[in-house]
UniProtKB/Swiss-Prot annotation:
Keyword Nucleus belongs to the record: yes
Protein purpose: Involved in pre-mRNA splicing as component of the spliceosome.
Subcellular location field: Nucleus
Species the sequence originates in: Drosophila pseudoobscura pseudoobscura
Region Disordered, residue ranges: 22-41
Stated name of the protein: Pre-mRNA-splicing factor Syf2
Subunit structure comment from the entry: Identified in the spliceosome C complex.
Family under the similarity heading: Belongs to the SYF2 family.
Pfam families per UniProt: SYF2
Oxidoreductase among keywords: no
Keywords from the named record: Coiled coil, mRNA processing, mRNA splicing, Nucleus, Spliceosome
UniProt GO cellular component terms: nucleus; Prp19 complex; U2-type catalytic step 1 spliceosome; U2-type catalytic step 2 spliceosome; U2-type post-mRNA release spliceosomal complex; U2-type prespliceosome
Sections of the chain in a coiled coil: 9-29
């Protein structure tokens, strides 16, 4: 009797363990399916989604802090500065200047043209509708132009516009001088090249093989080479 009871207990225990394993397998299958669905959803999002999400959360928190400061009658910008150290404030200011004026020198002609266009657009004077209507009335049909329109004798540049153009050209010349990468030639250096391209090639050879060819070069210069 005790032996049969022990056998039934073992069977019940095995069934309970089997049921527990079955539940765990179902839970693992459900978790895996949910993870696959979530991963597929993440793949369908834009590449910069996480960065945009963090930025949106920061903007919401910043707007809320600004509203709380205004409700308390405090200057929010001053409160932000109090939380920033002098070193961090200087770093932020430098980063802001680089962002406002990201001129790191010449890169490509397309980038240079686009930058010059943006700079000229920003430097345009404010819209003057009175001047616009006056010029429109003076020029008549020639105001909108056409295939045979000539404005040479109809318009005249103001001294202020001419001075502005001259100043702009002077600034362009100064910037080009600043970012010029042309090396100044040293008159005391040995002449072992025929042009600038050959000079660069010789310097590259000397950088890689100079220590191995120094003795051969000296013998050639002395005329004692075999």
């Amino acid at each position: 009797m005790e032996q049969s009871k022990s056998a039934s207990d073992k069977l019940a225990e095995r069934k309970a363990r089997l049921l527990d394993l079955h539940k765990k397998r179902q839970e693992a299958r459900t978790d895996n399916h949910q993870e696959v669905v979530a991963e597929d959803a993440r793949k369908k999002l834009p590449k910069n989604w996480e960065a945009r999400k963090r930025q949106a959360e920061w903007l919401l928190a910043d707007d809320k802090a600004r509203e709380d400061a205004q409700a308390a009658g405090k200057d929010y910008e001053r409160l932000k500065l109090l939380e920033v150290s002098a070193i961090d404030a200087e770093r932020i200011e430098k980063k802001k200047k680089r962002k406002d004026n990201p001129d790191l020198g010449f890169s490509t002609y397309e980038a240079q043209t686009a930058r010059q266009y943006s700079r000229l657009v920003k430097g345009m004077p404010a819209r003057d509708m009175e001047k616009y209507e006056k010029q429109k009335a003076e020029l008549g049909e020639a105001f909108y132009g056409g295939p045979h329109t000539t404005l040479h004798a109809l318009t005249k540049d103001t001294p202020a516009a001419i001075n502005k153009m001259v100043n702009d050209l002077d600034q362009q010349i100064e910037r080009r001088k600043k970012y010029s990468r042309r090396r100044i030639y040293n008159d005391d250096a040995d002449v072992d090249f025929i042009n600038e391209r050959n000079s660069k090639f010789n310097k590259k050879l000397d950088r890689f093989y100079g220590e191995h060819t120094a003795e051969i070069k000296q013998n050639l210069e002395r005329g004692t080479a075999i």
